[in-house]
């Protein structure tokens, strides 16, 4: 696949691609580098104010661990239908490259607490091997 860097948003073009390039407090950077060193991405909840780097860290972890990922912005798609369709289609298949998969739920505080949040536990248990 050929990509044209001229069409990237500036923030995406220059987003750090690995944890070492992220500007983080030392204790957080060390924690994330330990995750990379373990070679296994666990379920994580990253919290903090807007613009502090949560999404960047999630993407950098996936990149360093050669993990295929999909990102869902819950402020736009935070409902049970998204879980049943887009996320299920992604998580239920095995990666062509043989990589593990990760689902990044951005702005999860906007997810519907009555439907999506309770269903997520069973979903994680069902597809944790992928």
Place the predicted regions along the sequence by residue:
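P-loop/Walker A NTP-binding region and its immediately flanking N-terminal helices
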Residues: 1-130
């Amino acid at each position: 696949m050929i990509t044209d860097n001229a069409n990237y948003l500036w923030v995406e073009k220059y987003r750090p691609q690995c944890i070492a390039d992220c500007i983080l407090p030392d204790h957080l950077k060390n924690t994330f580098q330990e995750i990379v060193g373990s070679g296994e991405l666990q379920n994580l909840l990253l919290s903090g104010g807007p613009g502090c780097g949560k999404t960047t860290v999630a993407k950098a972890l996936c990149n360093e661990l050669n993990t295929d990922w999909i990102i869902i912005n819950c402020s736009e798609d935070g409902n049970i239908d998204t879980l049943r369709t887009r996320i299920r289609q992604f998580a239920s298949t095995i990666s062509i490259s043989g990589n593990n998969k990760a689902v990044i739920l951005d702005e999860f505080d906007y997810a519907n607490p009555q439907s999506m949040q309770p269903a997520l536990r069973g979903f994680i248990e069902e597809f944790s091997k992928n």
